[in-house]
Swiss-Prot record:
Protein name: General odorant-binding protein 67
Intracellular or extracellular location(s): Secreted
Family: Belongs to the PBP/GOBP family.
Keyword set includes Disulfide bond: yes
Any one Gene Ontology BP term: sensory perception of smell
UniProt entry tagged with the keyword Transport: yes
Pfam families in the cross-refs: OBP47_like
Lineage: Eukaryota, Metazoa, Ecdysozoa, Arthropoda, Hexapoda
Main function: Present in the aqueous fluid surrounding olfactory sensory dendrites and are thought to aid in the capture and transport of hydrophobic odorants into and through this fluid.
Location (main, coarse): secreted
InterPro entries membership: OBP47-like_dom, Odorant-binding_protein, PBP_GOBP_sf
Length: 204
């Protein structure tokens, strides 16, 4: 790996981890500031995972306050466990790593039913899979959490990219939608900009 790229990656990961640790539960990037609209209202991205799998995983990993508040023990977020569970249910997580080709195979019915997203989904899955593989190399020495963050990062990457490049015939020209694109480009997670209780997979 190029030493410059490696060094940049390490710096990025360290800074990101410091932000997360130093500001637990805070909206560091201002993702919710001045936002009155949700991503659901701007681009109707199809549900990629089976609804039964999603509901089963949400029931198995409910959102609740962490038991450890003394910064001891493994760190984790229920969203990471839900995402990991969903990816396993889709057969897209093998040996604790995201399997891009398996994910693409699992969403084939969705691709066929949504031709507007077909080409975009192919490119997005490949791009996000490659990105997650690089990030995993940089973070593999971090203290092991309850659930790996790779699955959650991959799903957020896929949906975030689909939103940023939403097909014109699906995109809704509403005030605030372009602002949401800018927020995602800045680093806000797609699922952090969704409505609560939505019908699609929600790992954050």
């Amino acid at each position: 790996m190029n030493p410059v790229v490696c060094a940049f990656g390490v710096i990025f990961v360290v800074v990101t981890l410091e932000l997360v640790v130093a500001h637990p539960g805070k909206d560091v990037l201002g993702c919710h500031n001045g936002t009155s609209i949700t991503v659901d209202e701007c681009c109707a991205i199809p549900m990629l995972a089976n609804k039964t799998v999603i509901e089963k995983c949400k029931a198995a990993h409910p959102f609740k306050p962490p038991q450890n508040t003394d910064d001891k023990g493994p760190r984790g977020h229920p969203g990471e466990c839900i995402a990991e569970c969903i990816m396993k249910g889709m057969g897209a997580l093998k040996n604790e790593k995201v399997d891009g080709p398996a994910f693409r195979k699992a969403i084939e019915p969705v691709v066929k039913a949504n031709p507007a997203f077909a080409k975009l989904l192919d490119d997005t899955v490949k791009q996000c899979h490659e990105s997650i593989n690089v990030d995993s190399e940089f973070t593999r020495y971090v203290t092991k959490p309850v659930c790996k963050a790779d699955a959650k990062a991959f799903i957020n990457c896929v949906y975030g990219t689909l939103f940023e490049q939403c097909p014109t015939n699906v995109w809704t020209q509403k005030d605030g939608c372009t602002q949401l694109k800018d927020k995602i480009k800045k680093g806000c997670a797609y699922f952090a900009l969704r409505k609560h209780g939505g019908r699609r997979m929600r790992p954050t």
